[in-house]
Amino acid sequence: MAEQVVEILVSGGKATAGPPLGPAIGPLGVNIMQVVQKINDMTKDYDGMSVPVKVIVDTDKRTFEVEVGIPPASALVKKELGIATGAQEPKHQVAGNLTMEQVVKIAKMKQDAMLAYNLKNASKEVIGTCVSVGVNVEGMTPKEAQKAIDAGQFDSYFN
């Protein structure tokens, strides 16, 4: 069985037969429109976010499977806040403010893909992403929020 794997980032629910998908899948002998339709069906809940997708093509049988990953933490942070982009200058501008409940929600979504051992550390990873997006947590800078977590200020969220 000759399998080819194509990994791409697509906008949720808006994959097209054009680049980057079409040129990568076209030569493998499967119906591109069927692949696009399946990707769009599987990613429609992530509308407007970049979603990692893996298309596994069996070139002998001309069949395919689609695996959808979880969007990057930065995309989940922006969606949770309802903003299109982060701050232009993250150290000098604030694009929004997450609550600890929102941080924990994102951490639970991403936990399987993270290296963190527990929810507390996964939440700290999400807060680390907030640095580059220009988002504060509970009115604190991300670094202050991480220190507050270390000090036990938000332990009630991790039990």
UniProtKB/Swiss-Prot annotation:
InterPro entries: Ribosomal_uL11, Ribosomal_uL11_C, Ribosomal_uL11_C_sf, Ribosomal_uL11_CS, Ribosomal_uL11_N, Ribosomal_uL11_N_sf. One of its GO terms (biological process) is translation. PROSITE patterns: RIBOSOMAL_L11 (PS00359). GO terms for cellular component: large ribosomal subunit. Part of the ribosomal stalk of the 50S ribosomal subunit. Interacts with L10 and the large rRNA to form the base of the stalk. L10 forms an elongated spine to which L12 dimers bind in a sequential fashion forming a multimeric L10(L12)X complex. Belongs to the universal ribosomal protein uL11 family. This is Large ribosomal subunit protein uL11.
